[in-house]
């Protein structure tokens, strides 16, 4: 039997198995609704029992990999850190009719006055969004941004008055990069009409030390994202599933969204500064890919000797799957 025929037969068998499971779930739903039993509890219990079956685990992994493959085909890839240009803090207010607004003046452009267009500011940069009144007009989804600099709310989603503020103090790397992405979006989609003299620009339209500090933090966050991207390629995240009794982590050649030639084995990847960990799939044969000094001495253990890795409790060092006990 050739490989293509065998793959087709396996897929058909998996499909029949999953159809049977679906029928069982339907039957259980009927019973549970009739006798007031919690469906979630019953399904979780059955899942724990069936986990002992290698065939059941294979069926679940096949389903997960099929979903991953479909998602990869239809999803739009996110832009990598290096694909977005750094924010230029200089805004030539003397050119092109740009203005320096006070916060009070900017408030007049909140969309409540028919005689004035709708403006908003982010990192002190003022954009004309009047062409999208269906988004920024009174009563619309994004009206809370109109007539003010609410930089922080672009990433926190806090639309209370106390959250509609310009400061970025205390924001995480990802939140700072989200603001950078929003600025890139507005630069591309809307006219830049000036700056607001407040936290990020002075009365002459020149960048303040606060803006310089924020942009330095954004660049640091960008470098952090690049380093994370490299780490993900070396130590891809594990597949995982959880229930009331714990869960399971396992590795495949596509786990973590990183397609590769090896599956690896699950390990705890420890962050040295915080001592937090995540599950990582680690190459367990041939030369390592991490470049760590500890793995260079071996030519056939992959990255297993990396100093930031630990075994999961009660899991075989060679196992492709590890149980997690809650």
Swiss-Prot record:
Chief subcellular location: secreted
Record text about domains: The cytochrome b5 heme-binding domain was proven to bind heme, although it lacks the conserved iron-binding His residues at position 136 and 169.
Signal peptide positions (record): 1-34
Domain Cytochrome b5 heme-binding: 98-197
Protein name stated in the entry: Neuferricin homolog
Superkingdom, natural source: Eukaryota
Gene3D superfamilies given in the database record: Cytochrome b5-like heme/steroid binding domain (3.10.120.10)
Record key words, sorted: Secreted, Signal
Pfam families cross-referenced by the UniProt entry: Cyt-b5
Entry keyword annotation includes Signal: yes
Any one Gene Ontology cellular component term annotated for this protein: endomembrane system
Annotated family: Belongs to the cytochrome b5 family. MAPR subfamily.
Keyword match Hydrolase: no
Cell compartment(s), UniProt: Secreted
UniProt function note: Heme-binding protein.
Disulfide bonds, paired cysteine numbers: none
PANTHER family reported for this sequence: MEMBRANE-ASSOCIATED PROGESTERONE RECEPTOR COMPONENT-RELATED (PTHR10281), NEUFERRICIN (PTHR10281:SF4)
